[in-house]
Amino acid sequence: MQAIQMTIPNFRLSKIEDYLYTLDEMKLVNQIGNAYSLAGDNEKAADIFYRLLQYMRCHLQEMVTSNRMLPLVLYNFARSLDLLERYEESARVARNGKEACIKYGHYQVLHSCLEIEAECDFFLGKKEESAERYREAFYICKVMRYEDDLQIIRNEAQKYLDIIF
């Protein structure tokens, strides 16, 4: 909070939409949401990511800077909703994140959006869709050499669907 208050002295999380942000300030707001999530307050994190998405949709519809941030914020929002066991919402947001990655050509969180969508689909009883999303996430991680994430996907796919990669 102190970092963003250096450039926006009256910044309040409850009023995210009341300010104009630089790309770096949007990254700070995103990191504040991540800090709440890591501390276990996923409800607060989800609210921060939701407000940041609303801000981005209102102020930065087609700007290049928002296009880089959009997939990341959608992923973080989906992750928070997943941790809150709000699977339908989380799957929808993760799909939006996947589409944003593809639309804007920013693939850093594509595999993560697919993994969240796969997990949510599993908990929603959509096992075939879940298996397909895990496969997609697995092969993206394999191609990109994301070894840590590859192992997470292997473990989840085996645990939930008895799929061995």
Please name every model-derived segment.
Residues 2-16, 50-61, 95-106, 136-146:
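Amphipathic alpha-helical segments of tetratricopeptide repeats
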Residues 37, 56-104:
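Alpha-helical adaptor scaffolds
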Residues 24, 31, 69, 76, ...:
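"A position-specific structural signal for the A-helix of alpha-solenoid helical repeats
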Residues 20, 27, 65-68, 72, ...:
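Residue register of alpha-helical TPR repeats
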